[in-house]
Swiss-Prot record:
This is Uncharacterized protein C3H8.04. SMART domains: DUF4210. Pfam families: Chromosome_seg, DUF4210. It comes from the Eukaryota. GO terms for cellular component: cytoplasm; cytosol; nucleus. Disulfide bonds: none annotated. It comes from Schizosaccharomyces pombe (strain 972 / ATCC 24843). InterPro entries: Atos-like_C, Atos-like_cons_dom, ATOS_Transcription_Regulators. Coiled coil: none annotated.
């Protein structure tokens, strides 16, 4: 589970032992700070300047944080500290601290271990979505835009497994194989958000990548860029739980015949639940389902669903609604194809 740690309150325990183990790994490094400078560090927040002056900290790594509860276990455990990987560990530590210690809070998400990743791959689950579908950061534009981009100032829950089935039907003249091509089924994982916000139910955020489904026979033989679609038609995406229960069926009509060769675009569909507030008389809209699909037009004029697709959904039925409530569907196409 993700956790938050305050950078100004985390203290450095066993400072002397920590310095000794790290210093032994950098016996050939002349730029390593002297012991007196290290001992003056009283908290994690003071390590920002210390790491910023250390060479080789241009890139950040999401899988290691020096201020996590495992920091002393990593550096104090002689079995885990080896001369071969010590400089690499310390560089990752310094890079991440230099980037994140400027803020008030730091987030540490547990990386997927090898056994868990192997288990997910054996089930056919796209581990790309598990590692990249969510990033904790500030809002980007509106709340909806932040959901679609995956940047939210809240922690994520444990991953949940889902599956999605993609199909398309053609509304234009095309090859017979594109009139109703075989469906493509993809397993993926989705997160829910965890935040201290009253009366707010966060939806699930999932991401699946078409190009990485190399084990699928359809992808190997017929769709090198992703899932090929006709220029005009209607996409059907069926979202299911692992037990086969259907959560939502997305029907996305589209027309990308105006796309030029070697261009990209996206389609976004949003489903709102609108309610009339009895007190204020205003109409309140709540995003319940969302879908963002990326489309590419190759140099040969073929259209594909490609790369990563994002989906937003809730696991509650919208049926049985009554009173001043209605469901509104909205489909958007990027300006390049309008």
């Amino acid at each position: 589970m993700p956790a938050c740690y305050c950078a100004t309150s985390t203290s450095l325990e066993n400072n002397e032992l920590l310095y000794k183990n790290i210093r032994n790994l950098f016996s050939t490094s002349r730029s390593f700070p002297i012991e007196q400078e290290w001992m003056n560090l009283k908290s994690i927040s003071q390590m920002k300047d210390f790491f910023s002056n250390f060479p080789g900290n241009s890139k950040a790594n999401n899988h290691f944080l020096c201020n996590s509860p495992l920091k002393f276990e990593i550096f104090n455990n002689e079995k885990s500290v080896k001369p071969s990987n010590g400089p690499h560990l310390f560089t990752r530590c310094s890079c991440r601290c230099n980037k994140l210690l400027s803020g008030d809070y730091i987030t540490q998400q547990q990386p997927i271990d090898a056994s868990a990743e192997h288990s997910l791959n054996a089930k056919g689950i796209n581990t790309y979505s598990l590692k990249n579908c969510f990033q904790r950061s500030g809002f980007i534009g509106s709340y909806e835009e932040s959901l679609f981009s995956g940047h939210m100032p809240y922690c994520s829950s444990v991953p949940f497994e889902f599956s999605i089935e993609i199909g398309v039907i053609s509304f234009c003249r095309c090859k017979p194989s594109l009139v109703f091509p075989p469906h493509l089924k993809i397993n993926f994982v989705a997160y829910s958000l965890v935040g201290n916000v009253d009366n707010v139910q966060f939806p699930y955020i999932g991401r699946f990548r078409l190009r990485s489904q190399k084990s699928d026979k359809v992808m190997n033989k017929g769709y090198p860029f992703g899932y090929r679609i006709p220029s005009v038609g209607q996409l059907q995406l069926i979202l299911r739980q692992t037990n086969g229960l259907v959560i939502k069926v997305f029907l996305v009509p589209y027309n990308v015949s105006s796309m030029v060769d070697c261009s990209k675009t996206w389609i976004r569909q949003k489903h709102y639940l609108q309610q009339l507030d009895d007190k204020s008389g205003k109409i309140l809209s709540h995003l319940k389902f969302g879908l963002q699909l990326q489309i590419i037009c190759t140099s040969a004029g073929h259209h594909y669903l490609y790369d990563s697709q994002r989906i937003i959904f809730v696991q509650q039925s919208l049926g049985g609604l009554y009173g001043n409530t209605k469901i509104v569907n909205e489909t958007l196409l990027s300006e390049s194809c309008r």
